[in-house]
Amino acid sequence: MQIVRRAVVGVYGVLAFVLGGMVSWIGVRMGIGMWVGALIAFGVFAWGMWPSWRRWRVARQPFPTAWRLWLEAHVPFYRGLDAVGRRRFERDVQFFLDEQRFEGVGVEVTETLRLAVAAGAALLLHGRPNWELPARRTFLFYAGRFNEDYDEDALGDYEGMAHAQGPVILSAKAVEMGWAVPHDGDNVVLHELAHLFDFENLDADGIPTLLNPASAEAWRRLMRAEMVKVRQGRSVLRRYAATSAAEFFAVAVENFFERPELLAHRHPELFEALCAFFNLDPRSSGQTQG
C-alpha cells in the first residue's frame, strides 16, 4: 500500500488540466479571465489527492506499543521482518484501520478484532507494495458461527463469508482462534480476504484479478490437479478446498502463509505459484521474489 499512487496522480493531473483548460478557455472568451479554470483545476486535483494526503497524515502517527506487541505474539511473518519491513507492515495496518469500517452484531468490536483483520491485509499485501485490497469494505463481526440466513447458530456452517458486493462477515471467535494458532493453516481472516482478490472478476473462479493474464491458464490447470489431490486425501489442504476453485484458492492462501514449509515440501509447484503471485517467500520474511 502506497501513500501516493502514480496512477492516481496521473489520472487526476490530466483531468485537472483538461477541465481547467476548457473552463479557462471559456473564461477568456467571456472576458472573465482564466482564474475560474485555475480554481477548478486545483479543486479537481486536490479532491483526487485527498486520500493520499490522509494516508500521509496517518503514516506520521506513532504505532501503538500494544499493537506492536500483539503482532509480535501472533504474526510469525512480522517477527521475522527487519526494521524497515516492520515499519511498512505497521503502516499498512494503520492505513487499513483508517480506511475500512468495522461493525458488530451482538458483539463488541474490540481493538484486537480490528487489528487481527488489518494484520491479515498487511500480510497479503506485503510483497506487493503497489497493490491495494480490492474495494473498501465493511467488516461485520458476529460472536460465533452463523447460518446461510445470517442468523447466529452454534451449529451453523459459516465462520466467515465474503461478498462480491457487500460486507465481509466474520465470527469474532474464529478471528481470534485463527491468530492464536498461527501454524495450522486455518485462518478465517486470510481466507475471506483472499476471496476479495477473486471477486474482482465478478464471478469467483479461483483466478485472482491481479494474476498475470499470461499465467491464468497455467494456474487453472494447477488448481484442477491440486483439487484432485485434495479429493483423494493426498493434500495438506483440508477437504473444503475441493468444493470449488474459489475455495481452493482461499484455503491455499491460508496454508501458504501459515504452513509454508509444509506446503513447499508437499506441493512445490503450488507453493512456487503463490510465491510468484504474492511476490514473497513466507519462509523468510521480507524476501521478495523480484
Write out the residue ranges for each language-model feature.
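Short, Lys/Arg-rich, polar N-terminal cytosolic tail immediately upstream
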Residues: 1-2
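Metalloprotease/metallohydrolase-associated module, dominated by Zn2+-dependent proteases
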Residues: 5-13, 50, 119-128, 144-180, ...
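Alpha-helical bilayer-embedded segments of polytopic membrane proteins, i.e.
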Residues: 5-22, 82
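Alpha-helical transmembrane segments
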Residues: 10-11, 20-26, 42-55
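Hydrophobic alpha-helical transmembrane segments
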Residues: 25-41
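A metal-dependent hydrolase signature that marks the N-terminal structural subdomain at the beginning
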Residues: 50-159, 163, 270-284
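Active-site recognition of the HExxH zinc-binding catalytic motif
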Residues: 82, 183-201, 250
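Hydrophobic (often cysteine-bearing) scaffold residues that line and stabilize catalytic clefts
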Residues: 113, 181-186, 246
